[in-house]
């Protein structure tokens, strides 16, 4: 009972916070400086239903090169399903504390867990976030262990996982073609990919200028597909040395290049720094889906992209090696890919 009580206490979503607990307060030099954020900038938007395939491929390539992030519209995932995913996520975080405590763990190796911050075992300052982490592929292997409450959770999230995986594979094809590679290159090279999900919950924060939902980081995987709360902004992307706010566009999904696609592109495409900030007015939720290479597959720059004028930027490695290195460090240290340069 004592351990369960401690787990409940760890979660931000179990209470309303009128004051800022000290363990969330960043040193002054590490605070988000919200007054310097560019609020009216835009990241590229790509219409996947455009009949001009060449234009879609070109737009995806340009976005990967210049921003590392883009939004997609007309992506084929039904708006009603997207709304259901967000609603069932909110229902989960509103469950009684004792119900949520059944899933709590601070062990990053667990495939299904509810936790808080990022890596509470290593951190000295925590982040203003609770999250439910799920492994999603193959579905039949993991769904039985997913939350049984809310009752519709497994069906809704399972359907979304299947559709978002197919969207990811379509995007791989466009990304491959934009690099001058065969359309199937990325999917084939990355092997039988794992798929993870993080359902992120950012409660109202009494002093948002003192902390983060997540500090600046890059994603260690290949491709991330983010479903954002279309009522509350919070994602910010580093572009040309400035933090820009990603303003939610109804019906859109946000795509970002992970570290592995930067490596496969030989540095042509960018896995960029991004962060999540919080606010004092409203809670916020997001659902991030991660496509991850097979652990044992060898990764490195595509041979076709290595020339005398453009030698290999990164050495070959396995995703297992990369992921272990990523988790052994603090989230906001130097870009993990720097450790794999030739």
Swiss-Prot record:
2-oxoglutarate binds at residue 284. Residues 193-293 form the Fe2OG dioxygenase domain. It catalyses: a (2S)-flavan-4-one + 2-oxoglutarate + O2 = a (2R,3R)-dihydroflavonol + succinate + CO2. PANTHER family: OXOGLUTARATE/IRON-DEPENDENT DIOXYGENASE (PTHR47991). This is Flavanone 3-dioxygenase 2. The keyword Metal-binding applies. Disulfide bonds: none annotated.
């Amino acid at each position: 009972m004592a351990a369960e009580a401690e787990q409940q206490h760890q979660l931000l979503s179990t209470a309303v916070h009128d004051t800022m607990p000290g363990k969330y307060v960043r040193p002054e030099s590490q605070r988000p400086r919200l007054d310097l954020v560019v609020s009216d900038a835009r990241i590229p938007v790509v219409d996947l239903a455009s009949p001009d395939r060449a234009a879609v491929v070109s737009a995806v390539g340009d976005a990967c090169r210049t921003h590392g992030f883009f939004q997609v519209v007309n992506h084929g995932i039904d708006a009603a399903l997207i709304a259901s995913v967000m609603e069932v996520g909110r229902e989960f975080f509103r469950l009684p504390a004792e119900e949520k405590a059944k899933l709590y763990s601070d062990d990053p190796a667990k495939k299904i867990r509810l936790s808080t911050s990022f890596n509470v075992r290593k951190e000295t300052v925590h982040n203003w976030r609770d999250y439910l982490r799920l492994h999603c592929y193959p579905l039949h292997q993991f769904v039985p262990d997913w939350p049984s409450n809310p009752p519709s959770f497994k069906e809704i999230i399972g359907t979304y996982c299947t559709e978002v995986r197919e969207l990811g594979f379509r995007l791989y094809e466009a990304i491959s073609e934009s690099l001058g590679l065969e359309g199937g290159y990325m999917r084939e090279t990355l092997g039988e990919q794992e798929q993870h999900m993080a359902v992120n919950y950012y409660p109202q924060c009494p002093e948002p200028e003192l902390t983060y939902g997540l500090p600046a980081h890059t994603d260690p995987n290949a491709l991330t597909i983010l479903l954002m709360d279309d009522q509350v902004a919070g994602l910010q992307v580093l572009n040309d040395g400035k933090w820009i706010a990603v303003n939610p566009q109804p019906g859109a999904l946000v795509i970002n290049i992970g570290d592995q696609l930067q490596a496969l592109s030989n540095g042509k495409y960018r896995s960029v720094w991004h962060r999540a900030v919080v606010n004092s007015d409203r809670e916020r939720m997001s659902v991030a889906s991660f496509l991850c290479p097979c652990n044992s597959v060898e990764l490195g720059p595509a041979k076709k992209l290595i020339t005398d004028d453009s030698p290999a930027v990164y050495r070959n490695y396995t995703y297992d090696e990369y992921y272990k290195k990523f988790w052994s460090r603090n989230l906001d240290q130097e870009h993990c890919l720097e450790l794999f340069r030739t």
